[in-house]
């Protein structure tokens, strides 16, 4: 049984991800980190899902039972956990979140002492420990050595300072009217505070979490309400975050939702113009062909990697780069953060608008993405794609029609993601129907 997916362990809370799994997984991770322990402290944060309380208590039980002390900081963005784990000199950090998923899902992500997401090799080692009954039992400590847990509520200030430090000192947001959609999620306190302290006129949406409304018709996956509000209020820009605030969607002053690759492109060029861009930009295999064209036109190389912001960061480290991201809105400025950070990306785009004295639409309009169609198809089983009869011929046929393809399984759900890209949208719509029918037969019998 495989526990880890694309971004940690994720599933339906109380079913796959129940208190037993959370406790045992925490013990397994704790056993792994014990060998490298310096402070014997592990940081635990969460988003605003109701199930977070259950999972947090289970994690604390697991860690303290093997002698670890736990620092609980409550609802905070995922990138805050990455930052605070290193800043507070903890052996590891744990974030309880299912990111953009509905409230009934939850997940567990791990960070090492430096705030980095774990490699697949380390995740595999933790999985092996998880299934080793003898090792789990042997790791339990005597009563006198059981760890302690304490809750700290004021660490939000540390993260706010670090975020504000990413914004140019010679600029102010005083001239900007900004609408923020915080998705009833982990950024509901942090995001408005940062923008207000930097001087912006701030209108906040979806900032009343009740444990069951995270990402519900709001945030990065549902930006329509934000778009309407930006237009109605004649705001300069709108920023939508997802439940754990590691991704960003931008809405321009006309109420148009920006393509994630357009955002990547203009931010990369902004870094280059400041002399801050190191090496090539990294995007994933799902990036739009227009992004590469735009970057190459401006003398910037583009490298690609697998889907997932941790793979973007790994590639950046290998290349000596400092900027990359995903079309979905995970954007990494590695000079400031170890993971995708929606707040940092929002501030950098604001700085770009202010320094250029241009509107959001005129800046984002520099990159004109090719039409793409993405279908998430629910499937019964995940067969090896290389062994599906007729798939090779299907891809060749699409290639002959100048259609780029990407077919990949979700790392966290029983889905296959079907992506087609071409200059002709009508052709895409026609061919997508054929592709969906092909995979329905191949994977659903």
From Swiss-Prot:
InterPro entries: A-D-PHexomutase_a/b/a-I (IPR005844), A-D-PHexomutase_a/b/a-I/II/III (IPR016055), A-D-PHexomutase_a/b/a-II (IPR005845), A-D-PHexomutase_a/b/a-III (IPR005846), A-D-PHexomutase_C (IPR005843), A-D-PHexomutase_C_sf (IPR036900), A-D-PHexomutase_CS (IPR016066), Alpha-D-phosphohexomutase_SF (IPR005841). Keywords: Isomerase, Magnesium, Metal-binding, Phosphoprotein. Binds 1 Mg(2+) ion per subunit. Its EC number is 5.4.2.10. One of its GO terms (molecular function) is magnesium ion binding. GO terms for biological process: carbohydrate metabolic process; peptidoglycan biosynthetic process; UDP-N-acetylglucosamine biosynthetic process. It catalyses: alpha-D-glucosamine 1-phosphate = D-glucosamine 6-phosphate. The active site is at residue 99. The modification Phosphoserine is found at residue 99. Its cofactor is Mg(2+). Catalyzes the conversion of glucosamine-6-phosphate to glucosamine-1-phosphate. HAMAP family: GlmM_B. Belongs to the phosphohexose mutase family. This is Phosphoglucosamine mutase.
């Amino acid at each position: 049984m495989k526990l880890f997916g694309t971004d940690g362990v994720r599933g339906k809370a109380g079913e796959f991800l129940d208190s037993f799994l959370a406790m045992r997984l925490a013990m397994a991770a704790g056993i792994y980190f014990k060998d490298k322990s310096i402070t014997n402290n592990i940081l635990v944060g969460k988003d605003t899902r109701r199930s977070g309380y259950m999972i947090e208590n289970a994690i604390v039980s697991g860690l303290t039972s093997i002698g670890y002390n736990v620092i609980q900081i409550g609802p905070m963005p995922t990138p805050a956990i990455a930052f605070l784990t290193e800043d507070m000199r903890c052996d590891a950090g744990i974030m309880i979140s299912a990111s953009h998923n509905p409230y009934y899902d939850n997940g567990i992500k791990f960070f090492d002492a430096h705030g980095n997401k774990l490699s697949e090799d380390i995740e595999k080692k933790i999985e092996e420990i998880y299934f080793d009954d003898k090792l789990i039992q042997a790791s339990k400590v005597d009563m006198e050595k059981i760890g302690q847990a304490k809750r700290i509520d004021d660490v939000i200030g540390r993260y706010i300072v670090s975020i504000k430090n990413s914004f140019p000192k010679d600029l102010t947001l005083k001239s900007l009217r900004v609408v923020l959609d915080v998705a009833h999620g982990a950024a509901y306190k942090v995001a408005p505070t940062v923008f207000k302290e930097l001087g912006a006129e701030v209108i906040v949406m979806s900032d009343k979490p009740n444990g069951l409304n995270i990402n519900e018709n709001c945030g990065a996956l549902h930006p329509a309400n934000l778009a309407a509000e930006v237009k109605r209020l004649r705001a300069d820009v709108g920023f939508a975050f997802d439940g754990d605030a590691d991704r960003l969607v931008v809405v321009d002053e006309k109420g148009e939702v920006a393509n994630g690759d357009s955002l990547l492109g203009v931010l990369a060029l902004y870094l280059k113009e400041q002399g801050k861009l190191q090496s090539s930009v990294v995007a994933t295999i799902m990036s739009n062909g227009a992004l590469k064209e735009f970057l190459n036109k401006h003398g910037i190389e583009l490298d690609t990697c697998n889907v997932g912001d941790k793979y973007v960061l790994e590639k950046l480290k290998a290349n000596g780069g400092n900027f990359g991201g995903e079309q979905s809105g995970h954007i990494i400025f590695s000079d400031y953060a170890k993971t995708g950070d929606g707040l940092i990306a929002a501030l950098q785009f604001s700085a770009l608008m202010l320094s250029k004295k241009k509107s959001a639409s005129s800046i984002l309009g520099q990159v004109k993405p090719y039409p793409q169609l993405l279908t998430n198809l629910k499937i019964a089983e995940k067969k090896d794609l290389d062994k599906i009869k007729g798939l090779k011929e299907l891809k060749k046929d699409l290639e002959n029609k100048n259609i780029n393809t990407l077919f990949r399984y979700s790392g966290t759900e029983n889905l296959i993601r079907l992506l087609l890209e071409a200059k002709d949208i009508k052709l895409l719509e026609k061919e997508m129907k054929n592709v969906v029918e092909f995979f329905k037969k191949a994977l659903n019998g």
